[in-house]
Swiss-Prot record:
It is a peripheral membrane protein. Could be involved in insertion of integral membrane proteins into the membrane. One of its GO terms (cellular component) is plasma membrane. InterPro entries: Membr_insert_effic_factor_YidD. This is Putative membrane protein insertion efficiency factor. Pfam families: YidD. NCBIfam families: membrane protein insertion efficiency factor YidD (TIGR00278). The lineage of its organism: Bacteria, Bacillati, Bacillota, Bacilli, Bacillales. HAMAP family: UPF0161_YidD (MF_00386).
Length: 88
């Protein structure tokens, strides 16, 4: 699913975006953000983050730097909770 979504974004970048004026209010661009979000967080959460970002890309939003949030390390959380419940 990730490959299909990223492929769709790449098609947009290659065949649509390059022929339109640069209007994205953010860095990285919304399409680059979408690819990174899907690569980092997977198809479902990455798509959610991309849609949320695109919904902010309008003339009434100031834009600016907006990077994909890092993926939370699930092992660190489970390791911590495991240590907290382990009796010596």
């Amino acid at each position: 699913m990730k490959k299909i979504l990223i492929g769709g974004i790449r098609l947009y970048q290659k065949y649509i975006s390059r022929f339109t004026p640069a209007t994205c209010r953010f860095y990285p661009t919304c399409s680059a953000y979408g690819i990174e979000a899907i690569q980092t967080h997977g198809a479902l959460k990455g798509s959610y983050l991309a849609i949320r970002r695109i919904s902010k890309c309008h003339p009434f939003h100031k834009g600016g730097l907006d990077f994909v949030p890092p993926k939370k390390d699930k092992n660190a959380d489970s390791e911590h909770s495991c240590k907290a419940h382990h009796h010596h």
